[in-house]
Design a protein with these regions (language model features):
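ATP-dependent adenylate-handling active sites, centered on carboxylate activation for C-N bond formation
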Residues: 1-132
């Protein structure tokens, strides 16, 4: 992520609104490449989508573990599946959107929770997943 990434702008706005302490963890190509073997070993999979999605979370969790005394995280995991990703914009009908949403929730355990589970726990952190409760 570059230092001018749009996500940083919005994260700062939210932190300012909540009067929260906010630290930006900038992750560049070199850091990602250096962590890649460790992330693959941690995940126990060669699935490229899982690996790609896990690297950032792993590195942020590692930073939190090494630089703070925080041990419990609140995550937004599962919210994309609940709210339909971008499919909400392109679904052919409300019925098909509902069917796809139900399918994603039924299959969630097969692919989407590995990233957070491993990336967080390997760094001695715990997660609270309100969208998954």
């Amino acid at each position: 992520m570059s230092e001018d990434a749009i996500d940083l702008k919005y994260a700062k706005q939210v932190a300012d609104y909540l009067h929260a302490d906010h630290t930006e963890v900038i992750i560049n190509k070199e850091i990602v490449l250096n962590a890649l073997e460790e992330v693959i070993a941690m995940l126990g999979t060669w699935d490229i989508t899982t690996i790609r999605a896990s690297v950032g979370m792993y590195l942020v969790c590692k930073y939190i573990h090494e630089h703070t005394d925080i041990r419990v995280l609140l995550t937004g995991e599962i919210s994309d599946e609940l709210f339909g990703y971008k499919y909400t914009d392109f679904a052919p009908s409300a019925h098909e959107f509902q069917a796809e949403s139900q399918k994603r929730i039924r299959e969630l355990f097969m692919y989407d929770v590995l990233r957070a589970d491993r990336s967080i726990s390997v760094n001695s952190l715990e997660a609270r997943v309100p969208f998954g409760d």
